[in-house]
Curated annotation (Swiss-Prot):
Protein family membership: Belongs to the complex I 30 kDa subunit family.
Residues forming coiled coils: none
Listed GO biological process terms: photosynthesis, light reaction
Record's keyword terms, sorted: Chloroplast, Membrane, NAD, NADP, Plastid, Plastoquinone, Quinone, Thylakoid, Translocase, Transport
InterPro entries: NADH_DH_suC, NADH_quin_OxRdtase_su_C/D-like, NADH_UbQ_OxRdtase_30kDa_su, NADH_UbQ_OxRdtase_CS
Recorded GO CC terms: chloroplast thylakoid membrane
Keyword presence, DNA repair: no
Subunit structure: NDH is composed of at least 16 different subunits, 5 of which are encoded in the nucleus.
Organism (species): Aethionema grandiflorum
Function text: NDH shuttles electrons from NAD(P)H:plastoquinone, via FMN and iron-sulfur (Fe-S) centers, to quinones in the photosynthetic chain and possibly in a chloroplast respiratory chain. The immediate electron acceptor for the enzyme in this species is believed to be plastoquinone. Couples the redox reaction to proton translocation, and thus conserves the redox energy in a proton gradient.
Protein name in the entry: NAD(P)H-quinone oxidoreductase subunit J, chloroplastic
Length: 158
């Protein structure tokens, strides 16, 4: 089932994939990394002027990484704002996604955190560097295949 934004994008020949609706009824779309920046600009011009949040997650060990954007379309005189969730998947071996910092400035720290924790490189981000972990840290702590250095599991402590 396609939502209103998916239909609108399809009429304009913009490549995407509808992932349905989440439990709150928010439309979820998948965008390819190479199409993400241009579609982000189009969505901003269309009225999605507020980036509510950006996060990332590891889909499966050895699998894809996902960058998730929650956008809101705020208009004067409208009681219920439109919301959409955009998912951009990338391979962990070459995890590069275009940054949307120049579209929504509020994604600055959020893309940096996704880089720091999962190693997703956001192309054209002006300050893409670690934000939570020290610069000397090796690896990406939130990847499912990450092995913590000097971690020892204590089985039977008593």
């Amino acid at each position: 089932m396609q939502g209103t934004l998916s239909v609108w994008l399809a009429k304009r020949g913009l490549v995407h994939r509808s992932l349905g609706f989440d439990y709150q009824g928010i439309e979820t779309l998948q965008i390819k990394p190479e199409d993400w920046h241009s579609i982000a600009v189009i969505l901003y011009v269309y009225g999605y002027n507020y980036l509510r949040s950006q996060c990332a997650y590891d889909v499966a060990p050895g699998g894809l990484l996902a960058s998730v954007y929650h956008l809101t379309r705020i208009e004067y005189g409208v009681n219920q704002a439109e919301e959409v969730c955009i998912k951009v998947f990338t391979h962990r071996s070459n995890s590069r996604i275009p940054s949307v910092f120049w579209v929504w400035k509020s994604t600055d720290f959020q893309e940096r955190e996704s880089y720091d924790m999962l190693g997703i490189t956001y192309d054209s981000h002006p300050r893409l560097k670690r934000i939570l972990m020290p610069e000397s840290w090796i690896g990406w702590p939130l990847r499912k295949d990450y092995i913590a250095p000097n971690f020892y599991e204590i089985q039977d402590a008593y």
